């Protein structure tokens, strides 16, 4: 478990590729630079897609974990 306190939470539960990453893009865009976003997803492809998204756009994936088929991600938006 982590003690990160997110500035925003994206609940993509029940959504399948490409919806979680599309929603992630919108949420990150609306987040202040350096802000922390927690993403909750159930699509296993997010294990591949979200780290690639962060790497490609320069955001920091602080942590990812799985809890009973739910995937959790903590993403720090890059500074402008």
Swiss-Prot record:
Gene Ontology molecular-function annotations: sulfur carrier activity
Top-rank lineage group of the source organism: Bacteria
Signal peptide: none
The keyword Cytoplasm is annotated on this UniProt entry: yes
Residues of the active site: 17 (cysteine persulfide intermediate)
Gene3D superfamilies in alphabetical order: TusA-like domain
PROSITE patterns in the cross-refs: UPF0033
Keyword Cytoplasm listed: yes
Localisation per UniProt entry: Cytoplasm
Keywords on record: Cytoplasm
CC terms in the record's Gene Ontology section: cytoplasm
InterPro entries in the cross-refs: Sulphur_carrier_TusA, TusA-like, TusA-like_sf
GO biological processes: tRNA wobble position uridine thiolation
Family note: Belongs to the sulfur carrier protein TusA family.
Annotated function: Sulfur carrier protein which probably makes part of a sulfur-relay system.
The protein's name: Sulfur carrier protein TusA
Lineage: Bacteria, Pseudomonadati, Pseudomonadota, Gammaproteobacteria, Pseudomonadales
């Amino acid at each position: 478990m982590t003690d990160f306190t997110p500035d925003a939470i994206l609940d993509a539960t029940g959504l399948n590729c490409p919806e979680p990453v599309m929603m992630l893009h919108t949420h990150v865009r609306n987040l202040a630079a350096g802000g922390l976003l927690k993403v909750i997803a159930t699509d296993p492809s997010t294990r591949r897609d979200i780290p690639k998204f962060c790497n490609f756009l320069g955001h920091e994936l602080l942590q990812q974990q799985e809890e009973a088929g739910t995937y959790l991600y903590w993403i720090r938006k890059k500074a402008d």
